Structure formats: C-alpha cells, structure tokens
Amino acid sequence: MTNIAIFASGSGSNFENIVKHIQTGQLSGINVTALYTDNEGVPCIDRAKNLNIPIHINKPKDFSSKSLYEQHLLKLLSSEEVQWIVLAGYMRLVGQDLLQAYEGRILNIHPSLLPKFKGLDAIGQALESGDTVTGSTVHYVDSGMDTGEIIEQQQCDIKPDDTKEQLEDRVKHLEYELYPRVIAKIIK
C-alpha cells in the first residue's frame, strides 16, 4: 500500500474524485492519509469530512517563513509515512523543503495543455487566445509554476460559442479521467 497526501486549496473536486476511485477499487494499492489544505472554510474540507478522510489545515501566514511552514508539513507527512504528494488545486508554489524531501514524488494537474497557459485562470487564457483546443496536463512538480516534466496530457475542443463555465466543465471531466489514470501508472 502506497500512502499519499492530497493537497488542495479550494473546491476539492479532484481530491474527491481520486478518493472515490480508491474507495471503489478503481485505483488500488493507494491510501490517502489526509487532505492538506492551506485555507479554512473551503469546500475541500467538507468533501474530506464526507469521505472520512483526515484533514490538516495549515495556514502559511501562521509561520514566520515558507521554510518553517514546509518543515511543519514535513513532520506531519513523515508521521503519516507519506510516500507521494498529489496536488489537486493547491494554489501555492511548492518550496525547496518539500521539493527536496519528495524529489520526483510530487504530482500536479493543471487545466491547460502545458506549456501553454500556466498559472491562474488557464481556462480564461485559453478562451482569450483564440486556440481551438485546450485540455489538462499532469506533471511532476518543480520549483517553477507549472514547469515540471509533463507526464501525460488530454485535450478537448474549444467551441466557438463556449462560455468559460462550459469549457471549465469539459476540462474538469477530462481531469476526472486523466488524474486517476496517471496516478495508477506512476504511483506504485
């Protein structure tokens, strides 16, 4: 059994999707030790409660430096014997402490076909670009913003009359298929 921690900052829909894949046996040999979130009062917390997944709420502003924040996280991760970190809507850059401790063992999913449209509002950027396709990317995490080695991508069309909400929904459904599939391949 491989222990993973899932980091999320907001909705937590990808977190919930991964946990449900594990709970239904579609993703075997993996245990989610906890949800790690950097915010209070966000939907991912309610999702974790409903799924009976432990929750760690750690706000960076409660620490005097990013390094101290990450050292605190590392103590929790170590106590839970976490082998992999899976980012699912975690809206912070991962710092050197976590990167060094989990080198090559942190995954992220991003709602664009990287290297296009890094960072926030990738869906909005894709719509404004005039591109006819976008998608989702699973990649290893490095010190940059959405710059790690790409593992796998899946694309969908951008329709001429798409609203942001319609395209977000289509990309989100890609992510629900893509992320568990990649996790099953990469995390053993």
Curated annotation (Swiss-Prot):
Q: In which pathway does it act?
A: Purine metabolism; IMP biosynthesis via de novo pathway; N(2)-formyl-N(1)-(5-phospho-D-ribosyl)glycinamide from N(1)-(5-phospho-D-ribosyl)glycinamide (10-formyl THF route): step 1/1
The record's GO CC annotations read: cytosol
Residue positions binding (6R)-10-formyltetrahydrofolate: 66, 91-94, 108
List the GO molecular function terms.
Answer: phosphoribosylglycinamide formyltransferase activity
Q: Which UniProt keywords apply?
A: Purine biosynthesis, Transferase
- Give the family this protein belongs to, as stated in its UniProt record: Belongs to the GART family.
- What is the designated name of this protein? Phosphoribosylglycinamide formyltransferase
User: Which species is this record about?
Assistant: Staphylococcus epidermidis (strain ATCC 35984 / DSM 28319 / BCRC 17069 / CCUG 31568 / BM 3577 / RP62A)
Biological classification of the source: Bacteria, Bacillati, Bacillota, Bacilli, Bacillales
